[in-house]
Amino acid sequence: DCLGFMKPCDINNDKCCSSYVCGRNNHWCKFHL
């Protein structure tokens, strides 16, 4: 299972879905640019 858009995430254990990345500042899954 992966975390969707705007879901809280852990920067050290990024479980965001493939299109997303864990934000370093707010620790939410956001679009990977």
Swiss-Prot record:
Q: What is its main location?
A: secreted
Subcellular location per UniProt equals: Secreted
Q: Which GO terms describe its molecular function?
A: calcium channel regulator activity; ion channel inhibitor activity; sodium channel regulator activity; toxin activity
Matching Pfam families, A to Z? Answer: Toxin_12
Q: Which residues form the signal peptide?
A: none
Q: Name one GO cellular component term.
A: extracellular region
What are the alphabetically sorted keywords of the record? Calcium channel impairing toxin, Disulfide bond, Ion channel impairing toxin, Knottin, Neurotoxin, Secreted, Toxin, Voltage-gated calcium channel impairing toxin, Voltage-gated sodium channel impairing toxin
Q: Which cysteines are joined by disulfide bonds?
A: C2-C17, C9-C22, C16-C29
What tissue specificity does the UniProt entry give?
Answer: Expressed by the venom gland.
Q: What is known of its domains?
A: The presence of a 'disulfide through disulfide knot' structurally defines this protein as a knottin.
More info: Negative results: shows no or weak activity on Nav1.4/SCN4A and Nav1.5/SCN5A sodium channels, as well as on Cav3.2/CACNA1H and Cav3.3/CACNA1I calcium channels.
Family designation: Belongs to the neurotoxin 10 (Hwtx-1) family. 59 (Tltx) subfamily.
User: What function does this protein fulfil?
Assistant: Gating-modifier toxin that inhibits both sodium (Nav) and calcium (Cav3) channels by inducing hyperpolarizing shift in voltage-dependence of activation and steady state inactivation. Inhibits Nav1.1/SCN1A, Nav1.2/SCN2A, Nav1.6/SCN6A, Nav1.7/SCN9A and Cav3.1/CACNA1G sodium and calcium channels at nanomolar concentrations (IC(50)=169-621 nM). Surprisingly, selectively slows fast inactivation of Nav1.3/SCN3A. Also shows moderate inhibition of Nav1.3/SCN3A sodium channels (IC(50)=1216 nM).
- Supply the name of the protein: Mu/omega-theraphotoxin-Tap2a
This protein's species is Theraphosa apophysis (Goliath pinkfoot tarantula)
